[in-house]
Amino acid sequence: MMMEHKANMAMVFVQIVYAGMPLLSKVAISQGTNPFVFVFYRQAFAALALSPFAFFLESSKSSPLSFILLLKIFFISLCGLTLSLNLYYVAIENTTATFAAATTNAIPSITFVLALLFRLETVTLKKSHGVAKVTGSMVGMLGALVFAFVKGPSLINHYNSSTIPNGTVPSTKNSVKGSITMLAANTCWCLWIIMQSKVMKEYPAKLRLVALQCLFSCIQSAVWAVAVNRNPSVWKIEFGLPLLSMAYCGIMVTGLTYWLQVWAIEKKGPVFTALYTPLALILTCIVSSFLFKETFYLGSVGGAVLLVCGLYLGLWGKTKEEEIQRYGEKQSQKEIIEEVIIV
């Protein structure tokens, strides 16, 4: 019972941390922080925070790094971290913090579709769990599109308020651009998830692998930022909210929540951790309503409902499939034992 409470509290804390990421990032970008420079500093904080723990805690799991493996890690970092995060922060500049939180609920759906395309996932439409996985993915992706592009009547409108921070209310044109960019960022992240599973089989030291990817991403982001913006003044970060946002995203989001999720997955399984994903969306919606005075439309609410329904439907299908597989394995082992006894 105590373990159950600890796992629940850990996952609630993780989602609170995740909810803070788009909110703080939005404020920092709105105050003039260059999004590409933001990614560089975020990854630098992450690499510095993870490296000592990776060195001391996983010394027994260290395995040799071949040139080919190092090259794989470099390109995975480029696609999944550097490209994904840079697109994410460009999107944050042109959309709302709520949309950024909402689209994370579509990640399982996008990952499932990509896994099917790469033949890493199988589905049986003759079984209820197979239908649930496909339907959940379709509903989740539909929810992301509805949230992004369907407005309808406004439910909460604060735009007439004089307390809105400058630059936090995107225009319609920028909202469309930001929505498409955010979906592209999530797609890159989903590709990272798929590629990560293969590399982890070759390099089992998880924390060292993440620390190495953060280091590569930091270097790549520096090159990207210099190539896009040659103005040296963009690298100067004043002590305040922008610096706090970078440290928060690097240390708290990439560092602390990683360990909490790994611990929860070991204790309760991956489905348990995924069930808490919509909590970040709810928290972000509440805070954004007061902080950024966001307008909430009926279409946004409908899209959020579809996202959450698609997430849970897909998770149910995946859980059911795993239960059937475990039952099949137990039956096979039982038959083998019976045959041995007979012989």
From Swiss-Prot:
GO terms for cellular component: membrane. Its main location: membrane. It is found in: Membrane. The chain crosses the membrane at residues 9-29, 36-56, 65-85, 98-118, 130-150, 175-195, 209-229, 239-259, 272-292, 296-316. Keywords: Membrane, Repeat, Transmembrane, Transmembrane helix. GO terms for molecular function: transmembrane transporter activity. This is WAT1-related protein At1g43650. It comes from Arabidopsis thaliana (Mouse-ear cress).
